[in-house]
Regions:
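Residue-level signature of transmembrane alpha-helical entry/exit and packing/kink sites
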Residues: 3, 7-11, 15, 92, ...
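Alpha-helical transmembrane segments of multipass membrane proteins
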Residues: 14, 18-26, 107, 133, ...
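Hydrophobic alpha-helical transmembrane segments of multi-pass integral membrane proteins
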Residues: 14-21, 68, 74, 78, ...
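Membrane-proximal soluble regions of multi-pass membrane proteins
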Residues: 31-93, 150, 154
Length: 156
């Protein structure tokens, strides 16, 4: 039993530490690097206006239930103000969706660290855990960005 507790604490501690490190580091990325989409943050054609997320993933039914921790390391962005926001605020929110998406992509890779001390079954568990925890957040960021880009284009 003692070994199992050590095993669990090691895995949980690894994830908590990884999430905090990544969360902190992405706040240090200069805004200029988040002004446009790159490889991982580029939206696919079917994502462009956000309707795919609503139709097939029913995102509007569950996205508000996902915990939001983005403001933990820095200034958060009050998302409820976006409906009446000026273009600059919308651009800021779009940039922050890129920051959050990048954070979750990197957090997903955290399972790789668990290969150093886990048996195969636990590595597979951590791989699944990484995706189950981060993919809803990734989807929400992509959905929000697609909708915000649409609003920004309409305003301009």
């Amino acid at each position: 039993m003692r070994d199992f507790i050590k095993f669990m604490l090691l895995n949980i501690g690894t994830w908590v530490l990884w999430f905090f490190i990544v969360g902190y580091l992405v706040t240090k990325i200069k805004d200029k690097y988040l002004e446009k989409d790159y490889l991982f943050t580029s939206l696919f054609g079917f994502e462009k206006d956000g309707t795919w997320f609503k139709k097939y993933l029913k995102i509007d039914k569950w996205k508000d239930r996902v915990p939001e921790l983005g403001g933990y390391f820095g200034d958060g962005f009050e998302k409820r103000t976006v409906a009446d926001a000026q273009s600059d605020q919308i651009k800021l929110f779009i940039r922050e969706t890129r920051r959050a998406e990048l954070a979750h992509w990197v957090m997903t890779a955290g399972w790789i660290f668990t290969t150093a001390f886990n048996p195969l079954w636990a590595i597979v568990f951590n791989l699944v855990f990484a995706h189950v925890v981060n993919f809803p957040c990734l989807i929400i960021q992509r959905y929000n960005r697609a909708r915000l880009i649409k609003v920004l284009n309409y305003k301009n």
